């Protein structure tokens, strides 16, 4: 494995491997320095591989995607805008955590949130498939020495009422986000200019976010995928983390990952999502 040397960090407790295709690509050279308590490193609470994810996420989150964008009030429609145009926004770059089973992705997510917490960004959102998984989130958060009750479910607060938390990690399910008032409730709690962490755990749950055309005709966008896109567009400065060991079974289903900067115009690797899909399908997936 090509890795970052972190002084005092302990090796991962289980053996980690990477595919030949991944090994053929040199990793980036990050300059980001996370803020984490020393005991987390020395006590092996986060392994060297898990600490790498905190560094890479922070490095990516330090910049924004190219260009300015206009988003309508529904957060459904987005288009390129001239630089300096009224109400135009810039989107912060997002990061994809695609480690497989056994890497401890929950603890990696907690580490990313804690790094930002220590830097003063004390509101975060953790989105997952099931409300029962809040226990796992609380366990991973408390493993880093934090109070587990700082992770609170959105379901604790009635729909249409303010989320009365001055700080904390709001745990939300994808099914809940499909509800427009609930989505607005989360956006209102985070507030204008929010630049904290939003985690899309099991991000493949947002598959078919943009709809598709198949042999049986046009398929409408999924409600969960659409809700995920709307949340991202409503929070342009948020530090987005996509988490999934199986990001997409079909490359078309990566439409939810707008913050990766894979498509979007002449300054991106691909002009649009269709061009990206065609290129990947033509080249094949390693």
Question: Each predicted region: which residue ranges?
Answer:
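SF2 helicase/translocase NTPase motor core
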Residues: 6, 13-45, 70-86, 92-96, ...
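N-terminal pre-Walker A segment at the start of P-loop NTPase domains
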Residues: 47-80
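Phosphate-binding P-loop
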Residues: 61-66, 85-94, 233
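Short, solvent-exposed loop/turn and secondary-structure capping segments
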Residues: 66-69, 209-211, 252-256
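The Walker A (P-loop) glycine that initiates the GxxxxGKT/S ATP-binding motif of P-loop NTPases
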Residues: 99
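Conserved helicase ATPase motor motifs in RecA-like P-loop NTPase domains
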Residues: 102, 204, 231-251, 255, ...
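Motif I (Walker A/P-loop) of helicase-class P-loop NTPases
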Residues: 104-114, 224, 255
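Short, well-ordered alpha-helices that flank and scaffold nucleotide-derived cofactor binding pockets
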Residues: 111-118, 139, 233, 256
């Amino acid at each position: 494995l090509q890795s970052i040397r972190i002084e005092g960090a302990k090796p991962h407790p289980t053996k980690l491997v990477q595919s030949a295709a991944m090994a053929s690509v040199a990793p980036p050279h990050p300059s980001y320095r996370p803020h984490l308590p020393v005991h987390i490193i020395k006590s092996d609470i986060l392994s060297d591989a898990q600490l790498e994810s905190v560094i890479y996420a922070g490095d990516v989150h330090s910049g924004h995607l190219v260009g300015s964008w206009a988003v309508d009030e529904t957060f459904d429609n987005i288009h390129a805008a001239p630089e300096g145009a009224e109400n135009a926004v810039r989107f912060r770059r997002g990061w994809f955590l695609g480690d497989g089973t056994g890497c401890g992705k929950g603890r990696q997510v907690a580490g990313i949130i804690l790094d930002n917490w220590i830097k003063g960004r004390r509101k975060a959102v953790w989105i997952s498939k099931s409300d029962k998984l809040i226990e796992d989130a609380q366990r991973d958060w408390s493993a880093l020495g934090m109070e587990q009750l700082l992770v609170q479910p959105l379901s604790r607060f009635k729909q249409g009422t303010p989320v009365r938390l001055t700080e904390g990690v709001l745990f939300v399910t994808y099914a809940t986000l499909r509800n427009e008032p609930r989505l607005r409730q989360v956006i209102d709690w985070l507030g204008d200019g929010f630049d904290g962490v939003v985690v899309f755990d099991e991000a493949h749950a947002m598959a078919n976010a943009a709809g598709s055309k198949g042999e049986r005709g046009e398929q409408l966008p999924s409600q969960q995928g659409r809700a995920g896109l709307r949340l991202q567009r409503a929070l342009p400065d948020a530090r987005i983390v996509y988490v999934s060991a199986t990001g997409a079974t079909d490359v078309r289903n990566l439409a939810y990952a707008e913050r990766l900067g894979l498509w979007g115009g002449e300054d991106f690797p691909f002009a649009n999502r269709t061009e990206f899909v065609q290129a990947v399908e033509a080249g094949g997936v390693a």
